[in-house]
Design a protein with these regions (language model features):
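Sec-dependent bacterial lipoprotein signal peptides
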Residues: 1-18
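OB-fold and OB-like single-stranded nucleic-acid-recognition modules
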Residues: 18-161
């Protein structure tokens, strides 16, 4: 009896360990959105933000990502919701990140600190972007859409059994 309880508890712990955030995205971060960071000066705040790539700009020694922010799920992955945005932000990290891999609309999560603000134009609108000095750039795998087609069994009777 004790062995059975111990086995069940061990299995629960092992399965619980599988359902966690990727290690680079773990930690304590300020619960603010990019829009809130612009409204009040949040320079120096540690954040974990994510969303979809709008543009990737490789520079001489760093790469900057212009992002549209979305909420993150419990794993730190951005939700894919067209109207659920928290504003826009720019995240920069030392090194080269290939724009062919980091294409527009790919999902990325960042951790880092807000190190300032930058004004850019979106069309004719002057937009103030929070600027994040990223410690982690986490590119998520592409979500695959799977169409599940259910068919009746090979006999004519339908039922709950």
């Amino acid at each position: 009896m004790k062995f059975r309880l111990l086995a069940i508890a061990g299995l629960a712990i092992l399965l619980g360990a599988c359902a966690s955030q990727p290690r680079p995205l773990q930690g304590e971060f300020a619960a603010i959105t990019p829009r809130e960071a612009v409204d009040r000066d949040s320079t120096g705040a540690a954040v974990r933000w994510g969303g979809r790539i709008i543009r990737v700009e490789p520079h001489e020694n760093r790469t900057c990502f212009e992002m549209i922010s979305t909420r993150l799920d419990v794993y730190g992955r951005p939700y894919w919701a067209s109207d659920d945005t928290g504003g826009r932000f720019i995240a920069c990290r030392l090194g080269f990140y290939d724009p062919a891999l980091f294409q527009p609309n790919r999902e990325v999560s960042f951790t880092g600190r807000i190190d300032g603000y930058e004004n850019r134009r979106i069309g004719q609108y002057d937009y103030r972007f929070p600027h994040v000095a990223a410690d982690v750039v986490y590119l998520w795998p592409v979500r695959e859409r799977v169409n599940v087609i259910t068919r009746p069994p090979p006999w004519p009777w339908w039922g709950w059994w």
